[in-house]
Amino acid sequence: MSEFSEPACRVLRPLTNYNGKQGLTYIEGIAAETVGAKGICMHLLTIPPGGRAKAHLHERHETAIYVLDGEAITLYGDRLQHHVLSKAGDLVYIPAGLPHLPVNLSGKPISAVITRTDPSEQESVVLLPELEAIAEEKVAALKSAKRHSVLT
């Protein structure tokens, strides 16, 4: 019998870090493994200055993000041809199957609460190594544009 077989409210103190397939370090949260979740996971993420995830998608699961602090650019699309800027207080939605990656171009960390409809969190993560060269080009262009806007 599982330790989560009886329905109960559970409180989790997020203390344990783990490395996600995406190349970022997450703080463990609500998941099938920690509380017996059946249809959702929630964890904390901090992206350091200059950090970014690997290009990836979540095969069958949607993602909702609440940005606590800092600002991130999320590249997305089949060729990472689009991007959105999110700042503290913003909510971000990423549909299932959409290639994407967050990047921190600022000088301070980004903190966010990440929620997915994947109770095992990393289960449906699919890395997209074929997009990494494109990601590097896009990030370099964004850095250049940011430097240029600061100088003008």
Predicted segments, located by residue:
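Residue-level recognition of conserved beta-strand positions in structured domain cores
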Residues: 44, 57, 76-78, 104, ...
